[in-house]
């Protein structure tokens, strides 16, 4: 039977009542979710015997047909925002869950040096917000999290290719790899495309540097996409989760995974 794996991608998890939750952009993702709503989603996973597995577990399944639990799910957190450490991690700890965090290394470097860091995002344009330090990222690793690459600067890789060619794209690979080696003593195994911006050439350039490349997309009315047995490791599919996703839609995601698997 074809198995379908939901990979849930989050950006910000904020405490209830936080000003940052007041985002209203009709037809667009917000990238934010309240802590209580996130906790409810994690409780749903626990209540329904969903087993949270790592990105590496899924890639082993895709490449080597390694076994996965029948009701596997993967949790991803993009960018390396500070709230991933201060808000998200305690919630996941309470359920015994771990996740993969895809970090922007220029931002982690700057924050670790006491400097401000700003990036351009699909949801907010240029924004300056707190990121994790490398010390905090190392605490995630110690807790069983995987850390993946998300470029050095959070650039759109297809645009980077058009503007700077292969050399520009590879710079967004080499700088994170150097930072990972220096700070974590290892190279990143997995990569997530910022804003899902990619093309065949970027895949070709990145495929020998990472075990997997993850996509990203958003639909106003969620159309769930799953990573399946036939999915390429260069096109790991996922679901964006934020406060535009109702709890009914969240439940439907898992119902579709089971029904159509």
Name every feature range the model reports, one short phrase each.
Residues 102-103, 148-151, 215:
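Non-cysteine beta-strand/loop elements that form the S-adenosyl-L-methionine
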Residues 79-80, 104-106:
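Beta-hairpin (beta-strand-turn-beta-strand) motif
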Residues 59-60, 86-87, 124-142, 175, ...:
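Alpha-helical scaffolding within the catalytic cores
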Residues 87-105:
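A short alpha/beta connector and helix-capping loop motif
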Residues 1-76, 83, 154, 158-190, ...:
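C-terminal active-site subregion of NodB/CE4 polysaccharide deacetylases
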Residues 46, 90-96, 132-149, 206-207, ...:
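Acidic (Asp/Glu)-rich catalytic clusters
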Residues 26, 95, 110-129:
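Aromatic- and acidic-residue-enriched segments that line the glycan-binding/catalytic groove
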